[in-house]
Amino acid sequence: MGYLKDHGFPSAAPVADRAGATLGRIAGKPAALIEFLPGMSVKRPTLDQLRGAGEGLAWLHLAAAGFDSHRHNNLGQAHWAQMFDPLHAAADDLKPGLSATILADLATLAAHWPSGLPTGSVHADFFPDNVFFKGDAFVAAIDFYFACDDFLAYDVAVALNAWCFEPDGSFNLTAASAFLTGYQSRRPLSAAEKDALPVLAHGAAMRFFLSRLQDWKPVEPGQLVKPHNPLEFERKLAVHREGVHLFARDPARA
């Protein structure tokens, strides 16, 4: 976060103590002080906010281009089959027959996953609640817990899943076009990246389905943190699986 701020991106930087350390302990637990950021997240973004979010993600990718620390994506495509191994019964409990469908998806993704795309530091969780606006203007991104190295276009695909689906589960092509227009105003996607977006978006939906399925359990009385329902991303998987031709109407080329 400090690197991004030093390179012009609006990120909250950790505050150093008198000795220059940014990580300390409070009550025996690791702790850090982080700068305050202005702005607010939105639940129903406007088209201008979608364009701003897309531009903000490209800004992040460009600002992080020289970052020389690296972190493997432990929730990336190479790990999905292993993540699903202990979850077959949980998938079928969620929806009868779902395990076989997910196995078929995993095989398809493994067979068609791209290689050689531009790689760099990615946010990997660029959801609306991690992005701040003032009015329609993008002003900051937060929550870099999952930040890692991966295809830059995979980060775009994560965002398309997060920002461009309607509450009824349908994919909003107009929203996707706005997001991608904003992104490409700062960092144009290559032809290979555009061609890979459908499979990357399918894979991004798989990543969040699997992590949510891992965490899914009944909410205990008084529990403050409620797990996210994996069915949201099961429905997104179905869109990518059955309606990939709709996504492939290529809003990236608009």
Language model: regions and residue ranges:
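A cross-family kinase active-site recognition segment
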Residues: 43-97, 117-119, 224-227
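Active-site acidic catalytic loop and adjacent metal/ATP-binding pocket
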Residues: 14-15, 107-154
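ATP-binding pocket architecture of kinase catalytic cores
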Residues: 1-69
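All-alpha amphipathic helical-bundle segments outside canonical DNA-binding/catalytic cores
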Residues: 189-201
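Generic structural signal for conserved hydrophobic packing positions in ordered secondary structure
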Residues: 14, 32-34, 60, 122, ...
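Charged catalytic carboxylate motif
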Residues: 52, 56, 101, 155, ...
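Active-site activation/catalytic loop segments of kinase-like enzymes and analogous catalytic loops
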Residues: 153-188, 202-219
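ATP/Mg2+ or Mg2+-diphosphate-binding catalytic cores
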Residues: 86-88, 208-254
